[in-house]
């Protein structure tokens, strides 16, 4: 398996006060976060109501790291980039499931931000 330090550093797990390792995304659907080039740099997780009754936090994201800064990433950009270039426009939606729903409906030039408000660097990223 992987070393404890690696699992904590990557954000897949966290350490409790009593030094136990816990899965950050337990009971959640996991969404990989890709860079523009397709590299997976983080994960997001949405709670499954049936698996985690009483959980108050609907979404959990990987913590920022050496390779992941949420203000620099757009969810779905890797899969949307060709459609954005082809159609010369991009829809910015709220979250992971919105991007997936639109892709399933045939609208591929769509991304979601990780920050509110939307940062200026997103505008630059969408103009590449």
Q: What function would you assign to each model-found segment?
A:
Residues 1-128:
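Phosphate-handling DNA/RNA-contact segment within nucleic-acid enzymes
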């Amino acid at each position: 398996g992987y070393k404890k330090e690696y699992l904590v550093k990557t954000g897949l797990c966290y350490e409790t006060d009593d030094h136990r390792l816990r899965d950050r995304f337990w009971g959640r659907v996991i969404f990989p976060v890709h860079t523009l080039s397709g590299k997976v740099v983080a994960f997001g997780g949405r709670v499954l109501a049936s698996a985690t009754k009483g959980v108050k936090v609907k979404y959990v994201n990987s913590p920022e790291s050496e390779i992941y800064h949420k203000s620099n990433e757009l969810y779905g950009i890797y899969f949307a980039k060709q459609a954005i270039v082809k159609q010369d426009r991009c829809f910015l939606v709220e979250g992971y499931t919105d991007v997936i729903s639109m892709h399933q409906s045939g609208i591929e030039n769509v991304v979601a931000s990780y920050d509110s408000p939307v940062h200026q660097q997103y505008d630059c990223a969408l103009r590449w």
